[in-house]
Amino acid sequence: MPELVWLNPHDTVFPPTTSALEDPNGLLAVGGDLSPARLIAAYKKGIFPWFDDSQPILWWSPDPRMVLLPQNLHLGKTLKKLAKKQAFKITIDTHFSDVMQGCAQPRADQDGTWITTDMENAYLELHKLGYAHSIEAWQDGELVGGLYGIAINRVFYGESMFSKVSGASKIAFANLATQLASWGFYAIDCQVATEYLASFGAAEMPRVEFEQILQQSLQSQPPKCQIEGWQNSWNMPDYGQLF
């Protein structure tokens, strides 16, 4: 039976993902830190941190993995109707910290939040370095929804989303997926299965297949947005794609 590995605080090496536990699914390692170098090394291998204030840093690589191929984005009739109403203005990388704080707010079905202050600070640093990005949904000048994640070459690793108004995060996500498809991204990592993500066309795949996509991404030419910047390359209409 695989044993849980405590990370060496002096390097950013992770154990093979094949050594991750089956129960809980994907728990791979404990400890380390949330430095940019360690986080980037983790995401390149499909590993992500997920823990709360009462726990040490926990690192995960679940099998199977929930993934959306951007070209497979599915939009239901209700979402298409909402998009055509142009109810939300969509922006990119204008209020990263506010989006994280929105995602960190307690939810009705949760006792607390896994987006701790340390996590906020770590991802804000990744945002400053050009790896972490936010997509914002606005209504009447108020931030009412959005999401954030990490982009490394041609894979976007989704982290969390929030909505204060019904449909806000869905419109933000749909526009992100549409833009990523046009930029030639290979995949959007959704981590673990939910009905919400499945409604967009995301599906589970074996971890080994997901890791093959990661390797293809790392070996490919950087996308336009990485070279020119996300804000400079973003070409969705102000009120989103009408689909």
UniProtKB/Swiss-Prot annotation:
Catalytic activity: N-terminal L-lysyl-[protein] + L-leucyl-tRNA(Leu) = N-terminal L-leucyl-L-lysyl-[protein] + tRNA(Leu) + H(+); N-terminal L-arginyl-[protein] + L-leucyl-tRNA(Leu) = N-terminal L-leucyl-L-arginyl-[protein] + tRNA(Leu) + H(+); L-phenylalanyl-tRNA(Phe) + an N-terminal L-alpha-aminoacyl-[protein] = an N-terminal L-phenylalanyl-L-alpha-aminoacyl-[protein] + tRNA(Phe)
Job of this protein: Functions in the N-end rule pathway of protein degradation where it conjugates Leu, Phe and, less efficiently, Met from aminoacyl-tRNAs to the N-termini of proteins containing an N-terminal arginine or lysine.
Keyword field contains Transferase: yes
One GO process term, biological-process aspect: protein catabolic process
Entry-linked Gene3D superfamilies: Leucyl/phenylalanyl-tRNA-protein transferase, C-terminal domain, Leucyl/phenylalanyl-tRNA-protein transferase, N-terminal domain
Localization (cell): Cytoplasm
Gene Ontology molecular function: any one: leucyl-tRNA--protein transferase activity
PANTHER family: LEUCYL/PHENYLALANYL-TRNA--PROTEIN TRANSFERASE (PTHR30098), LEUCYL_PHENYLALANYL-TRNA--PROTEIN TRANSFERASE (PTHR30098:SF2)
Gene name, Swiss-Prot/TrEMBL: aat
Predominant place of localization: cytoplasm
Organism per entry: Saccharophagus degradans (strain 2-40 / ATCC 43961 / DSM 17024)
Keyword terms of this UniProt record: Acyltransferase, Cytoplasm, Transferase
Name of the molecule in the record: Leucyl/phenylalanyl-tRNA--protein transferase
A GO cellular component entry from the record: cytoplasm
Entry's family note: Belongs to the L/F-transferase family.
Main EC class the enzyme belongs to: transferase
E.C. number: 2.3.2.6
